[in-house]
Structures are given as structure tokens and as C-alpha cells.
Swiss-Prot record:
The organism of origin for this protein: Streptococcus pneumoniae (strain ATCC BAA-255 / R6)
Protein name (database record): Phosphate acyltransferase
Any Pfam family: FA_synthesis
Activity regulation note: Magnesium ions lead to a slight increase in the catalytic activity.
One GO CC annotation: cytoplasm
Function: Catalyzes the reversible formation of acyl-phosphate (acyl-PO(4)) from acyl-[acyl-carrier-protein] (acyl-ACP). This enzyme utilizes acyl-ACP as fatty acyl donor, but not acyl-CoA. It is active with both saturated and unsaturated acyl-ACP.
Length: 330
């Protein structure tokens, strides 16, 4: 049985969206058990599942504006902290939260703990591409600064995830840069390029540019945390902008535009789904001793369900243990 500790109080629509996502996951997956951490009375308002689920009551939670490290240290009974401690103590196999991203990263670093020989765990998510397959990118902001060695480790981590969780036999690994030529970039990018090119275990395809990411140029894209986070926000903003422009064009375009939208309803719905990368799950803090997964703060029940499905796959394929063995040299 796969045991997942869930912070029921994190996120914009908690606990309703969290609990409703859990209800659906428990209905569909008979091999998971969920531990819900949070206000018992509020959780019970939405909990319909009766088997393989437990509630661990706490009145304390971490707010979105709390300073991450201080919150983890001072709010010992916060729902997120208790969920992370359950993983550390072996009572759960993974932790999920839609709450404060920085606090969850701190919980992953300081409570769950790093895998031996991994210097800086990175935040990774599967982002959308025009062909619907998506690409994995890290680091998306777990670290403000990185070395070439860190980026090399991210390439290995991302490749492991793409193989074992997404089922890509030979993931194409690209280094995000300001040009595709091998000589491009600052000293960090140049040194990283040399390390990736020398690693025969990677299917390294060279430098990739930001404009090509959504065209599916690579399966795994490596970046430092600052750059990766900027690209993530750019993709999110572009997706919202496209949908906003379409909505404005339809509502302001008169009867013809509305009739056209009606005819294209299924296509427009498909486009919206394609741009909504939360359907594939949450962002993984990769490089810690168990799956620590952050679903978007505005996640609905469907996104929570997708993230639980993602965690289930990670546990099924034992990707964290495989990663630990790889980095320990076993």
C-alpha cells in the first residue's frame, strides 16, 4: 500500500479542493492510502471516502505570506510540517501540498532530507508542448544560484524521471542557453555544457533556446533556479494571455465570432487543456529522500487528483530509490 501524506490546509481552495481530489483518487486507485493533515471538522465537510483514509487533526497551518524557513521551525504542528515529518518517520511514503512553495521546499530540505551526494535538490515540473507530450524542466526556483555541478546533477535527475515516470526510453536532455552553438553562454553555461557532453549516460542534444521549448525540442531542460523560474512564469503568463485574447476576441467579435466559437468549442477546450499543465501533476522537489510534490496554489480537485496519480507512479517505479542508488554509486 502506497501511503501519501497530504497537507489538507494548503492552497487557495483548501480544504475543499484538496479533499475532493483525494476522494476521487481513493475511488480510482485501490493501492493508495491517504493521511490528511489539517482541521478535522473542515476536512469532514468534504470527505466522502471511508476507507484507506485518516485525518490527523491540527489547528495550525502555514500561510502563503509566512517566511518559509521560520515557519517550518516555529510552526511545529502546522499541517505541512506534520505531513513532512510523517515521511521522515516512515509513516508515509510521499508528501503533497498546495501551500507555501518556499515552506514546502524547506520542509523537503530540512525534514525529509537530501539524498546522499546530491548537493542541491531542484524543483521540477512537466510543462506543456504543442504536441501534447510536454517536457521536464529543472530547476524551477528551488535555488537562487547554481554551479555547473548542480546543473549536471539536474540533468541526471531529470533524465531518471523522464525514463521511469514518463516512460521515455532515451530522454533528450537540453541545456537552456541564449543560443544553440556550443560556444554560447556565460561561464556557468559553458562549463555545464562540457560536463553534460562528457557524460555518456545522458542523451545530451546540446543547447536549447527558450523560444523552442514549447515546440518539444527536448524532453528534459536544465537551467539554474533563477532562469528556470523566470521561464516558468513566462510560460504561465503566455498561456493565460492566449486564453484571455481568445475570450476577448470572441465576446467582442459579434454574432459571427460567437457562432465560430460554438463550432470550435471542442478545439478550444482542447487548447485550454493542453496549456493547463497541472493535468500532468505537480512540481517535484527532486533530490530528497522521498517524493515531495507541490501542486499549484490555485489547484482544483482535478489538479490534486492528477498530482496524487503522479505520486503513485513515482512510488510504483521507485524512482527516488533508483536515484539514491545511482548517486551513492551502488
Amino acid at each position: 500500500m502506497k501511503k501519501i501524506a497530504v497537507d489538507a490546509m494548503g492552497g487557495d481552495y483548501a480544504p475543499q479542493a484538496i479533499v475532493e481530489g483525494v476522494n476521487q483518487a481513493l475511488s480510482d486507485f485501490s493501492d493508495i492510502e491517504v493521511q490528511l493533515y489539517g482541521d478535522e471538522a473542515k476536512i469532514k465537510q468534504y470527505l466522502t471516502a471511508t476507507e484507506r483514509v485518516s485525518i490527523i487533526h491540527t489547528d495550525e497551518k502555514i500561510d502563503s505570506d509566512d517566511e518559509p524557513t521560520r515557519a517550518i521551525r516555529n510552526k511545529k504542528n502546522a499541517s505541512m510540517v506534520l505531513a513532512a515529518k510523517a515521511v521522515k518517520d516512515g509513516e508515509a511514503d510521499a508528501v503533497l501540498s498546495a501551500g507555501n512553495t518556499g515552506a514546502l521546499l524547506a520542509a523537503g530540505f530540512f525534514i525529509v532530507g537530501r539524498i546522499k551526494n546530491i548537493d542541491r535538490p531542484g524543483l521540477m515540473s512537466t510543462l506543456p508542448t504543442v504536441d501534447g507530450k510536454g517536457f521536464d524542466m529543472l530547476d524551477l526556483g528551488a535555488n537562487a544560484e547554481n554551479t555547473a555541478q548542480h546543473l549536471h546533477q539536474y540533468a541526471v535527475l531529470g533524465s531518471f524521471y523522464a525514463k521511469n515516470v514518463r516512460g521515455i526510453a532515451q530522454p533528450r536532455v537540453g541545456l537552456l542557453n541564449n543560443g544553440t552553438e556550443s560556444s554560447k553562454g556565460d561561464p556557468l553555461r559553458k562549463e555545464t555544457y562540457e560536463l553534460l557532453a562528457a557524460d555518456e549516460s545522458l542523451n545530451f542534444i546540446g543547447n536549447v533556446e527558450a523560444r523552442d521549448l514549447m515546440n518539444g525540442v527536448a524532453d528534459v531542460v536544465v537551467a539554474d533556479g533563477f532562469t528556470g523560474n523566470a521561464v516558468l512564469k513566462s510560460i504561465e503568463g503566455t498561456a493565460m494571455g492566449i486564453m484571455g485574447l481568445l475570450k476577448t476576441a470572441i465576446t467582442g467579435g459579434g454574432l459571427r465570432a460567437k457562432l465560430g466559437a460554438l463550432l470550435l468549442k471542442d478545439s478550444l477546450r482542447g487548447l485550454k487543456k493542453q496549456l493547463n499543465y497541472s493535468d500532468v501533476g505537480g512540481a517535484v522537489l527532486f533530490g530528497v529522500k522521498a517524493p515531495v510534490v507541490k501542486t499549484h496554489g490555485s489547484s482544483d480537485a482535478k489538479a490534486v487528483y492528477s498530482t496524487i496519480r503522479q505520486i503513485r507512479t513515482m512510488l510504483e517505479t521507485d524512482v527516488v530509490a533508483q536515484t539514491a542508488r545511482e548517486f551513492s554509486g551502488e
